[in-house]
Amino acid sequence: MESLSPGGPPGHPYQGEASTCWQLTVRVLEARNLRWADLLSEADPYVILQLSTAPGMKFKTKTLTDTSHPVWNEAFRFLIQSQVKNVLELSIYDEDSVTEDDICFKVLYDISEVLPGKLLRKTFSQSPQGEEELDVEFLMEETSDRPENLITNKVIVARELSCLDVHLDSTGSTAVVADQDKLELELVLKGSYEDTQTSFLGTASAFRFHYMAALETELSGRLRSSRSNGWNGDNSAGYLTVPLRPLTIGKEVTMDVPAPNAPGVRLQLKAEGCPEELAVHLGFNLCAEEQAFLSRRKQVVAKALKQALQLDRDLQEDEVPVVGIMATGGGARAMTSLYGHLLALQKLGLLDCVTYFSGISGSTWTMAHLYGDPEWSQRDLEGPIRYAREHLAKSKLEVFSPERLASYRRELELRAEQGHPTTFVDLWALVLESMLHGQVMDQKLSGQRAALERGQNPLPLYLSLNVKENNLETLDFKEWVEFSPYEVGFLKYGAFVPPELFGSEFFMGRLMRRIPEPRICFLEAIWSNIFSLNLLDAWYDLTSSGESWKQHIKDKTRSLEKEPLTTSGTSSRLEASWLQPGTALAQAFKGFLTGRPLHQRSPNFLQGLQLHQDYCSHKDFSTWADYQLDSMPSQLTPKEPRLCLVDAAYFINTSSPSMFRPGRRLDLILSFDYSLSAPFEALQQTELYCRARGLPFPRVEPSPQDQHQPRECHLFSDPACPEAPILLHFPLVNASFKDHSAPGVQRSPAELQGGQVDLTGATCPYTLSNMTYKEEDFERLLRLSDYNVQTSQGAILQALRTALKHRTLEARPPRAQT
């Protein structure tokens, strides 16, 4: 396990707590009325038991033949931690010697209703669908073990880790091997980070395993020959098993490997405690770096507001309204338009009034490029705009030249050597970098902190979605992942890592293997991953209407209302979660529709972490929970080895979730929408989504006239909800720009051609797939976006005054009392 650098994450807002472990005894008694798949005989049933919080532990009863009423009466023991969500999975299988064993049924049971010292007998049934029943007894007993040290934010729990150091000494071995064959020792520790490690005999070798301290597990090992690739000797020769619980921390134990043809092989074992400090920051509040940035930025914003609104006094820090830019996706169109919007804000002296700057998909290309310059908002934006125009107008044939392809290959090979899992998305990253820059850009997300040191720029927030790699479409399972120069993490779990560690390997919140931070282009490929769309998502996009999307959100809301995520002592919902297996054909078809062959894969920094006993009822978790899987800990992201990150626009074309993190509390949002049609659709979807989660969002109710002929700027608010920010929405429309070269300046006949911007025609140059613009097309789109913001100056200033008034009223009472 690697140590944190001095620049690692700050201390956790939640202190460690000691909690006792318990022994759970599960006795599988009998089953009744089992159906069988074999037409010629009854079932040959057995039961598999797994506990979501005991990784690597799987128990199996004996198989009973030809019976629909098996009686096992077998007991199994788990060591459990009561502060985590312990869900027992019981599965009855019908053994088949020819084909794969058939599953009869499966039940998930939350054991929180098992009271200490009281025997509980449960009968699990499949009614009303079937008559199958399974009788099981549960007994919870206290152990004499010392309490376990936990770190938790009440959603995620980091448990205590131990390290097992294994030294293989085979230098004195006189191994008898035929035909120069080599003997290899394989060591397995189920549930550990490493799982399996191997070494050839003949040299001294050292291994280290990281495993959960409160885990009833064992180290197993075998010798095998390299030539035959099979186990050496019979089933017992060269095989060893070492239970880890009896090992004394800090005490070395030496043992011989029982291999008749390799005498003298010894293992030296030593268990040690792992450092308690986490590399993953657990907490829903803003990190210390962002809080310090906010204090610095408010000084800049206060000065800008005083000048823009012509105030006669300086603002106090608690009076400064928080303004955010919320940019949508749209490929090169979004990139170009965003430059125009920012240019207009700079001309109006309003860019320094902005504190947060969020984006997704194509808008992140603008953001990533600008933040390569620590002083970008203080410099003339015409420079970056010329740069973007030059590269967007150039031919893209060079991007696929033999020389470039060879350079891509070398870069991908280097990434693989560094430990990054390489996918097609990484190739897309290099192609995108070549398109937008024409050269290798040695910039990283952590380097953008230089642009925040004095509060001289807004804080950039990049959004992505984590989805299931297979079997579920984006609408049914998605988790927001936020990237900032300070941290990368999940809004839903309250778990974050510094950007330097994104892509590194973690286990139970500890850094296991540090991998170099990726260059910014590889993150841009994640944020704008146009290749991650699975077939079911594509089918939905092709066949759905806006109304069906609304219905989807409403259905999800009703589902949450009918089946709340908060669990009672009876755990009735989990008890009823009978998972019926589909046919092989159905599963194959589902996999075909939902597979993501071109998704991006990143090591999961949540790997090994567990869910708190009351995670479902935590406000911050339930805010972002929206699927049945959220009540099944074994199906959530901490159980996955890798993240599957995709473009957030595949769900809603919005970057709004970042605006609702606790501690940010925006007063005014400038919404820049880059859709070519339906200028209010994404915003209305966002309102539905936010309201379903209890997030304060203004009412988005454009008039029929505005729907038919949208203006440059629309104001939305909700007087009934003071917590909801004011929202100024800027759709991508060509309204008065057709006739005006600047606000209030009518175009001359010679200038009318410059006002013709084709946004909807059959020859529109701004389609999502187009990455090459003519210079005049780039210029028209840029000037249109610039104009639309400048002509809305009055609306922006009035919204700023209203936001300032609200903040000032909130700030006055505490001062008045002093």
Swiss-Prot record:
Expressed in stratified squamous epithelia, such as those in skin and cervix, but not in other tissues. Strongly expressed in the upper spinous layer of the psoriatic epidermis, expressed weakly and discontinuously in atopic dermatitis and mycosis fungoides, and not detected in the epidermis of normal skin. Substrate binds at residues 330-331. Residues 5-124 form the C2 domain. PROSITE patterns: C2, PLA2C. The keyword Membrane applies. The keyword Isomerase does not apply. It comes from Homo sapiens. This is Cytosolic phospholipase A2 delta. Its cofactor is Ca(2+). Ca(2+) 1 binds at residues 38, 44, 94, 96. GO terms for biological process: fatty acid metabolic process; glycerophospholipid catabolic process; phosphatidylglycerol acyl-chain remodeling; phosphatidylinositol acyl-chain remodeling.
